[in-house]
Amino acid sequence: KDIFHTGYNLDGLTAYEEQTGDKSFHSNIEKGFDFYIRNFFEADGTPKYYHDRTSPIDIHCPAQLFVTLHKLHRSDEYRAEAERVMRWAVKNMQDRRGYFYYQLKQGVSSKISYMRWSNAFMFCAMSYYILDYGK
């Protein structure tokens, strides 16, 4: 139901398909990706936690996009979307000291620098971004 578990599930199904040659879930992967890309992002690159509401925005919300685009071999097709989401994430979720915030929400946001949850996952996502787009 949420953005990052949806992306993670698509990644897992794709890995299964590629490693086994079993294409029986391929139409489900395509339908799931179509839902993911159409419903979890605003036009300006803002990620939505759930398909029907934005808040809270966890760092995994924008980060998962880059992993999923790479693993589903859709990076070229969705480059403009990826660039919008990366700009949004850096502008809104990166501290001026370089680390990434855990979560933005109305009222009180958690701008704590968690090594595993926020930074490691966003650095992983940025690695895929650099690998796919060379920036």
Predicted regions and their residues:
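Glycan-recognition and catalytic cores of secretory/periplasmic carbohydrate-active enzymes
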Residues: K1-K135
